[in-house]
């Protein structure tokens, strides 16, 4: 897999800016280069190595056709998460994380089925047979479900992994994934506990450019792995067809 990052690029994106030193988590000490003006500066050489390791693991998962859920509900992350996850064809959560999204997935699936049912009502003539008040109530219900669950509407089973922006904010998602043994990839800022994550990417999880750089690299990696998977499947089918043709001659 070609290198996705350059140190200069990460510097321009502000990946190295951590939190105020007084708000740090001591467990992040190995990833901190220095303190400057009361702010911790992340060691980008370590970020570079660890990000590439994380992307290799993501590539391995995506190449088998399994799904990686992207999670980021903070203001700076939500648009990026939605755009990049949709581009990569992955499930995502960019609004509120509902408790039980992973640990009570069967109930969440019921809500998704309800959302799909209301959408069908809009097109199959059902809305023509109910009152205006009932229509408005159903539309409001659907809009709420779409806003919260739209990113996982096509997810039929638990994801193989999570990629998280800001594990402190998404602590419920992290806790659920850990309880189920689902690997967690994450941008981990200097105020967070890296022990909660399987693949730590020490990085500024507040700056839009930093988030965009990392999430885009994840989406690119998934797309490349999926493309390679399809190519390999086509080649395998061609080889199988050629063998059958040879056997029939």
Curated annotation (Swiss-Prot):
SUPFAM superfamilies according to UniProt: Ribosomal protein S2
Keyword Ribosomal protein included in the entry's annotation: yes
Domain of life: Bacteria
UniProt-listed GO biological process terms: translation
MF terms in GO: structural constituent of ribosome
InterPro entries, A to Z: Ribosomal_uS2, Ribosomal_uS2_bac/mit/plastid, Ribosomal_uS2_CS, Ribosomal_uS2_flav_dom_sf
Presence of keyword Transcription regulation: no
GO annotations of cellular component type: cytosolic small ribosomal subunit
Keywords tagged on the record: Ribonucleoprotein, Ribosomal protein
Gene3D superfamilies for this protein: Glucose-6-phosphate isomerase like protein, domain 1, Helix hairpin bin
HAMAP family registered for this protein in UniProt: Ribosomal_uS2_B
Entry-linked PANTHER family: 30S RIBOSOMAL PROTEIN S2 PROKARYOTIC AND ORGANELLAR, SMALL RIBOSOMAL SUBUNIT PROTEIN US2M
Family statement: Belongs to the universal ribosomal protein uS2 family.
UniProt name for this protein: Small ribosomal subunit protein uS2
Species the sequence originates in: Chlorobaculum tepidum (strain ATCC 49652 / DSM 12025 / NBRC 103806 / TLS)
Recorded name of the encoding gene: rpsB
